[in-house]
């Protein structure tokens, strides 16, 4: 693509592509994909896009913007990279250069993370005013899209549009061509604005590019942090004291807004888990909340440097003490006691969960593990197949009624995306589950087959919508004007839509 625009400082690459479409006067999403990528199947992704090798080639004449520079300076990748380990980070970079097919989101934990982001577009009015003054146009800024943290680091709460990023899989929306809201509510949670300002350097610091501590390093970092701050008793973390320190910085209202409320009575509380052995990665937001509360004098980069500086040699484990082996008579008695408990409670698991069984199991595991494992394997109960938890027939009937209501509502509307099977399912409350189990839902499958919109029908609907719009605006009808308003071209229009166009407009 010629004259591809150069990204502005802190601009998302998504926004740069949207501006390219505006500069070239391209109104068709698929045509823009053709021009930029040479591939009509690329999905417009805001935070973690792929195919960045193509963008780097478009910007080759600038002498800048290698793939890694685009990733670290014009995507949200720096918010995930420091927390997933070096190997996974490097593999994600490789995938983002080419066709990732959603693998990057899975690899970086976005899909399974408890930190969920609102997919609606958002902006900061004060930042937009600065952009217009400096560049003469507005664009989507990276620090407006901190996942689950809709706050500008400089000016506070962001303004949301009704339109979401995934409303159209292939559409790149430009901020400069979006009507800005004049009336919007103000949020007064200054704690979250301060948190956004604390996190923002993570997006811009070149030093952070090589900082990806391992899970072992994170484990040791938090253990030492608790010890240094006196938040331990003997060798145990005082989770109540940790929670108290976090609450001194962040109110329950702020934590609930981030969906990170502290459930101290639950063993699965995220704040407890982050101070235990790390078996999985935690999000940038969880780390940042702890650091800002417990390490207020350190920047986010300095905290990362401290964790990265911990070497494997400094991670030591205590050797297990060698106990005196019991005599055979003691072992025989313990064996008999365990066998009686298993028969009494009618199962190994139930026996272990009893008060005396837990102690006895631990003793045997320590002193005669081979016998315990061998005997338990011989006396395992056959696990009965669980009863089906879902009545698929009932769900099929409920879902098909929901779909029919949606389809009926769409009949009176011309202004909606193409009603494909996947789009229709997304409009239902549990569309993802329905899509994965479609083979168990014959009524839903039949409904989708009958009512999903073909390409021809979709083009005819767009022509109808364009015709009505031009008539209402009292604009002279021309074939090219109808096609342009319907975002169609002579090359892409189907035969059926072409016949409909001739019927509406007539031969030129």
Swiss-Prot record:
GO BP annotations listed:
DNA recombination; transposition
User: Which UniProt key words apply to this protein?
Assistant: DNA recombination, DNA-binding, Plasmid, Transposable element, Transposition
- Which Pfam families does this chain map to? TniQ, TnsD
- So what does this one do? Required for Tn7 transposition. It may at least play a role in DNA sequence recognition. It seems to be required for specific binding to a region of att-Tn7.
Task: Please give the name of this protein.
Answer: Transposon Tn7 transposition protein TnsD
Q: Which organism is it from?
A: Escherichia coli
Keyword presence, DNA-binding: yes
Keyword presence, DNA-binding = yes
Superkingdom of the organism of origin: Bacteria
Could you cite one Gene Ontology molecular function of this protein?
Answer: DNA binding
Write down the DNA-binding region ranges: 222-241
